[in-house]
A protein has these predicted regions:
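N-terminal helix-turn-helix
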Residues: 2-87, 92, 252, 256-260
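Short, structured helix-loop boundary elements
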Residues: 12-16, 70, 74, 87, ...
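Short, acidic, Ser/Thr-enriched surface-loop or helix-capping motifs
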Residues: 66, 115, 216-218
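Short regulatory alpha-helical segment in sensory/regulatory domains of signaling proteins that mediates
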Residues: 98-106
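Short, hydrophobic-rich beta-strand element in sensory/regulatory alpha-beta domains
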Residues: 107-114, 120-121
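Short hydrophobic alpha-helix segments
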Residues: 124-126, 226
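Short, solvent-exposed recognition segments
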Residues: 132-204
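Extended hydrophobic
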Residues: 178-250
């Protein structure tokens, strides 16, 4: 997390900050939160927690369960996140290219993601013809260590940064194929950096495969990633691997529009 400047602290309003911390808590928990949750997370007394929660609910950003008294994120928050995604300039720029990519692989899901601190966020997705849909929906956070997008978006960060991220986020095991060793992860990210391809072969979701490639800006920095993914019942791992040349071609075109010039 970036350090606050002196000016930021000078103009900071503590109550407003706590309200946003409560919303962050609700997002992180991904379920209803209680007064006790807020007390523990923010180190405030129950009376303050009650007042903060009810103030946010009165503003329409939390819904209160009349039976349990717990609070959950409201549809107003969903509208905010949807508007944020729709206003993302990168998302608007890449959509035509993602649609063309989907027409080449209609059985696959086409995804675009970005890194925001320790978080890997899906900001766009075109679903394949086949159902069911998987976890990758716009606005969702996915782990960095076992997804194709996570790997391409972190492969240039450096060993010390990756180790620190792993300590903060953990290397949770989702399937028998998930990388849970920091040494194995560092080797995998080095391969990702060298080949400019992030691979997820049943690491995050059982029987789901993904290939991802980076998008660069004019400074040669990775600013996003795009991927092709599908359940094995729709496309085999070999078919997902065969998508890589077209995937790279699409990413190169997007990077070129952003001003990137490969050496």
């Amino acid at each position: 997390m970036p350090e606050k400047s002196v000016d930021a602290d000078k103009y900071n309003i503590k109550v407003a900050e706590r309200c946003f911390q409560i919303l962050d808590l609700a997002v992180a928990k991904n379920s209803a939160i209680s007064i006790q949750d807020v007390c523990q997370s923010l180190d405030v007394n129950p009376n303050m927690a009650f007042r903060l929660l009810n103030s946010i609910a009165n503003a329409g950003y939390l819904d209160k369960d009349p039976l349990s008294g717990a609070f959950s994120l409201s549809m107003k928050c969903l509208r905010l996140s949807t508007t944020a995604l729709q206003s993302n300039g990168l998302r608007k720029l890449t959509m035509p290219y993602l649609e063309l990519l989907w027409h080449s692989f209609p059985k696959a899901n086409i995804n675009m993601g970005i890194r925001n601190g320790d978080d890997i966020l899906i900001i766009d997705r075109i679903d394949g013809n086949s159902l069911p849909r998987t976890y990758f929906t716009p606005g969702k956070k996915i782990p960095f260590h076992c997804t194709g997008l996570g790997k391409v978006l972190t492969c240039t960060l450096g060993e010390a940064v990756i180790i620190a991220m792993a300590e903060r986020c953990g290397l949770k095991s989702y399937t028998p194929e998930t990388i849970i060793s920091i040494d194995a992860l560092l080797r995998e990210l080095e391969r990702t950096k060298r080949e400019r391809v992030g691979r997820d072969r049943n690491e995050f979701i059982v029987d789901d495969n993904c290939s991802a490639v980076p998008i660069f800006n004019q400074n040669g920095e990775i600013v996003a990633g795009i991927s092709v993914s599908a359940l094995t019942q729709n496309m085999s791992a070999d078919e997902i691997e065969a998508c890589i040349p077209k995937l790279k071609e699409t990413a190169d075109r997007i990077s070129g529009v952003l001003g990137y010039q490969s050496i």
